[in-house]
Amino acid sequence: MTPDDPNNGNDTIPILIRELDDPSIDNRHHAILVLAGMGAAAVEPLIRALADASDNDRRWYRAIALAKTGVPAIDPLIAAMEKNTDHEFRRYAAAALGEMGEPAVEPLITAMASDDKELRGVLSRALCRIGKPAVDPLTRRLSDANEILRSCATLTLWQMGETGLPSMVEQIRDEKKV
C-alpha cells in the first residue's frame, strides 16, 4: 500500500463498485452490503464513483452504498458536495445523507451556512428526507446569530410541512412572549 493509493490498498473496492452496475440486482445488493461493511475505506472511492456516474441508475446504487456506509461518509460527502457543483452529484449525495438519518442532521445544518444557494437547497432536502429527527435541531437554529442558518432553518421546517411547522410556530409564539 502506498500513501497515494486511492483504494487504501483494498483492490476489491473497484471491483465491488463495478458490481453496482451488474445487470443482476442480487449482485448489486451484494456489492452494496460488502461496500457498506468496509466502512471508511470505501467512502472516497464511492464518492469518486458517484461523481463519475453517467446515469441516474449508477448514481442511485452508489448513493445507497454511501448511505449504508453511514457515519464515516457524512463529512466526506458534505465536503465533496461543497467542491463538486454538478447538480446530479449533489442531488444523489444529498439523498445518501438523507438516508443516514439523525447522525447526519448537525453536519447538514452546519453546512447550510454556505454562501452557495444550490448547496443549501440540496442540504435542506436531505434534512426534509430525515424528517422528525431534524426538527428540534432546526428549531434551535431559528434564533441563530447566523442569518443564513436562521433563514435555512425556517425554510426547511416550512418545507417539512406537518412535521416541521408546529415546532416553528411554537418557537415564534415563545419569542413573542419574551
Each predicted region: which residue ranges?
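Structural detector for internal amphipathic alpha-helices that build alpha-solenoid repeat scaffolds
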Residues: 1-10, 18, 25-40, 48, ...
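A conserved position within tetratricopeptide repeats
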Residues: 20, 50, 81, 112, ...
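Short glycine/proline-centered loop/turn elements that form peptide/ligand docking sites
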Residues: 45
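Glycine-centered loop/turn positions within well-structured domains
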Residues: 136
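Terminal, low-structured helical/coil segments at or just beyond the last alpha-helical repeat
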Residues: 166-178
